């Protein structure tokens, strides 16, 4: 019983010694960055094997990005891809209308598709330029155009 009393007393002291300071705290700046800083193109396809955990057919993913350019003034991010990483047997099945694009954006920013653009990170139609609204933590917004094209 004595042990429980000491444990309860220790918890009581711990709760009372914490602070509920609500004023005099340093104001921190919110991030104002709303840029696309990196981008990648991937191709996903079904492999021959089975996933041992689920028993489903395995899904393979191949990295395709070869070059990137960022035009901050015009808010255009271009990703050029090469299909040389795709296995020869699968290469004929590649189409931009089912490519997967993933991007990195400024710290604490959010991104959402606009004007019918596909969601990022899942297969989507990249045969056309797509627009995304990037919102910084401080509320600043920019509309970015992502262009996916073959690398020549």
Feature map (PLM): residue ranges:
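Sec-dependent N-terminal signal peptides
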Residues: 7-13
